[in-house]
């Protein structure tokens, strides 16, 4: 992940490079802000550097955060996970005022699937592809203090994006005590989900 910032015109850019598990395709995602718009440009190439996909997306500033990109083992598609802030969710009594959306981008079209966070706070959600399934993982909180309460899990069909399974699994009280501790300086600083495949 390469970041660069240009302060004179209030613009910035991010470049992300991703290779599929079979090492037969790679993707480049370029995100940049300029003025009131945020833009994302996606490319997919095979190993002979033949361009398979080029797609552009544009959003109002501060409404969308790109979380991750993922590639299929065999299909020529890019999966883009985004966190989307919605004005319709401003009056929610509890939980985050946003939802997640996963886009399946091919050379001919874009499919989308909306993932609601319900009454939880889900600061981050990342998807990875294994065979014909997409798996999403993220830590969630039940309170606005963002102390993690458990792990959110989603299983989607990688072709249709149909949600096959979803679950919010809460941590045990002992784990929460170990994580946050009785005393501030005794808490566990970070929890990391390692590569699972």
Where are these regions (language model features)?
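Short beta-strand elements that form the blades of beta-propeller/WD-repeat-like
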Residues: 16-18, 22-35, 43, 69-70, ...
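Repeated scaffold domains used in trafficking and secretory/extracellular systems
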Residues: 8-17, 61-71, 119-128
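Beta-propeller domains
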Residues: 29-57
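Beta-propeller blade signature
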Residues: 39-50, 93-109, 148-162
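Peripheral, non-catalytic segments that deliver or gate enzyme domains
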Residues: 133-134, 141-144, 152-158, 179-197
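Surface-exposed loop and turn segments in beta-propeller and other repeat-based domains
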Residues: 1-8, 57-61, 113-119, 160-193
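Asp-box/WD-like beta-propeller blade repeats and closely related beta-sheet repeat scaffolds
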Residues: 1-8, 98, 108-135, 139-144, ...
């Amino acid at each position: 992940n390469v970041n660069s910032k240009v302060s004179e015109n209030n613009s910035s850019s991010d470049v992300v490079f991703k290779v599929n598990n079979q090492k037969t395709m790679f993707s480049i995602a370029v995100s940049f802000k300029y003025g009131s718009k945020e833009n994302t440009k996606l490319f997919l190439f095979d190993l002979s550097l033949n361009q398979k996909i080029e797609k552009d997306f544009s959003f109002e500033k501060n409404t969308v955060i790109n979380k991750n990109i993922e590639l299929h083992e065999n299909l020529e598609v890019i999966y883009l996970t985004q966190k989307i802030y919605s004005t319709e969710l401003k009056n929610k009594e509890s939980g985050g005022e946003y939802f997640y959306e996963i886009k399946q981008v091919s050379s001919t079209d874009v499919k989308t699937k909306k993932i609601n966070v319900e009454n939880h706070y889900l600061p981050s959600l990342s998807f990875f592809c294994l065979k014909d399934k997409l798996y999403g993982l993220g830590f969630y909180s039940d309170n606005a203090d963002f102390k993690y309460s458990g792990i959110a899990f989603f299983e989607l069909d990688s072709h249709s994006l149909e949600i096959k399974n979803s679950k919010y699994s809460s941590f045990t009280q002992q784990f929460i005590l170990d994580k946050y501790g009785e005393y501030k300086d005794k808490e566990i600083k970070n929890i990391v989900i390692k590569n699972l495949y």
